[in-house]
Every structure is written in structure tokens, then in C-alpha cells.
Amino acid sequence: MSNILKFGIPKGSLEDATVDLFKQAGWQVGISSRSYFPTIDDEEMNCKLIRPQEMGKYVERGTIDVGIAGRDWVRENDSDVIEVCEMVYSKVSRRPVRWVLVVSQDSPVQKPEDLHGATISTELVGFTKRYFAERNIPVTVEFSWGATEAKVVDGLCDAIVEVTETGSTIRANNLRIVCDLMESVPVLIVNKAAWADPWKQAKIQQIATLLKSALAAEGMVGLKMNAPNSAVDAITEILPSLNNPTVSHLYNSDWVSIESILPEKEVRSIVPKLLKMGAEGIVEYPLNKII
């Protein structure tokens, strides 16, 4: 096979969620605990496990053609890559993560300017330095190897810049968020030379379309039913849909078939209403993709 796309799968917190996303999109990815080279049932692709913190530099160099990494790490490394699309998912939820400025609960700091001359600990050193430099706030930024929250509690620094999804760990450590510095989501990033290759660009666009369609189907289901003609207006009035419900006349009958796509959590409340309106044969089915 002459055409091979080198794809970087993020190792760590996004790893399992990424494998699940590929599965829903139509690819089977297998990861061994002893290998950094996942298998994939697509002979046009080779996969490598790479830390999101390093994904940008490897894509920029062309070591891999395309990969998934948080926008935060792409910005941290100032990587010169093409961002194809956002893919909002994480280890906990389907929402962005936030990099926040955090101090101890009893700190007098209320805004970034109050940290003049302070020491800040974070994994996101480059971004944090640029953030304060752009605002002409002199600070010392130190790299944290982990357990960052404990450092501000123990007085090893004046503040930290830390990532959070829910804020629960920050609150549990008796810390307080001063402000949000950046919101980040996973992004599909591509090497510029790879994007200029027609075959690779087409393959990347195929992958992007199917991954995004799998994300769009999260929490959505299909619902179909039969109903008398006389109930169509009332049913379609209450039935959620992507655009409008599909209504098809049944052969040699004064009944119709109605089909719609809606959030799964709404089914439990809408089915009793549909039954009262005369709907029958209601079927709910799962969705893998919405394109």
C-alpha cells in the first residue's frame, strides 16, 4: 500500500475515549499495554500513541501526518499546524476543559493583576508566561511535575494555573478559582505538507467527517411510529427533530409512518403523549452517526 496516513492517538486521559469514538465512527482500534503502536482495521492508516503534550511538535515535524490533541497543548507549544476541526469530548464529559488561575481560599488575590511579583506553578508554562507578559504583570512561572494543587496549599507558590472540567478537585482542596485563562477542546491537527497532499487531505476529511458524525450522535436516538392521518399535525407539533419529522403514507391505508431523531432523554416524557394521540408501534433505535 503506497498511500499510508500516519495518525497520532492521544495517550493518557483521552486514550479510551478516543478509541471509543473511532469505534462509533466505524474503525476498530486495538491498544496493547506493551505497545505504542495501536492496530486499526484500515490498511491505509498507521497509528501511534503519543502524549497530547507532544502531539503538536510531532505533527509539525511530519513525524506523523495528523493527530488529536487538546488545543491547550497546541497553543502551549506554539505548534505550526493546521487545525481541521474541533471534537468536543474528554475523559469525563462531552464539554470543554478550562485552564484556570487558582489561589488558596484565604488569599487576598481577586484578579490576575493582584499577582504582581508572585510565583505561579503550572504544567502550562509557555502559555502562562505569555498570558501575564501580554498584560505587563511580572510573575515567575515554574513548571510543575504534578500534584499542583498541593503546592499552593503548602505555600510553595502563590498561585497555580490548572486544568479542570468540573472544579470539584479544586474545591476539595480548599482552593478558589480567580478566573478562567483558556478553554480547550480536543482538535484534529494536520501537518501542512500532509494537508497539501490530495490523497492525504481526502483521507483526513473522511476521518474528520465520521468522527464528528459520531460525536453528533451522542445522546441521540431515532424514534418511529405509525399514526392515523388525523393525528399527524398534533404529533409533529410535539416531536423534536433535526429539521422536521419524516412522514410517509402507508400503502392502502389512512395511516402514516412518522420518524424523527431526538435526544434520548426526551423519549421518556414524549412516548406517553404519543400514545394518547393514537400513535402505535413505537420503536426507538440507537444511532452511531449523524452526518
Curated annotation (Swiss-Prot):
Known function: Catalyzes the condensation of ATP and 5-phosphoribose 1-diphosphate to form N'-(5'-phosphoribosyl)-ATP (PR-ATP). Has a crucial role in the pathway because the rate of histidine biosynthesis seems to be controlled primarily by regulation of HisG enzymatic activity.
Family: Belongs to the ATP phosphoribosyltransferase family. Long subfamily.
Compartments, as annotated in UniProt: Cytoplasm
Activation/inhibition comment: Feedback inhibited by histidine.
Keyword line: Amino-acid biosynthesis, ATP-binding, Cytoplasm, Glycosyltransferase, Histidine biosynthesis, Magnesium, Metal-binding, Nucleotide-binding, Transferase
SUPFAM superfamilies in the cross-refs: GlnB-like, Periplasmic binding protein-like II
Catalytic reaction annotation: 1-(5-phospho-beta-D-ribosyl)-ATP + diphosphate = 5-phospho-alpha-D-ribose 1-diphosphate + ATP
Source species: Geotalea uraniireducens (strain Rf4) (Geobacter uraniireducens)
GO cellular component terms, A-Z: cytoplasm
Protein name listed in UniProt: ATP phosphoribosyltransferase
GO annotation, biological process: L-histidine biosynthetic process
Pathway terms, separated by semicolons: Amino-acid biosynthesis; L-histidine biosynthesis; L-histidine from 5-phospho-alpha-D-ribose 1-diphosphate: step 1/9
NCBIfam families attached to this UniProt entry: hisG, HisG_C-term
The enzyme's E.C. designation: 2.4.2.17
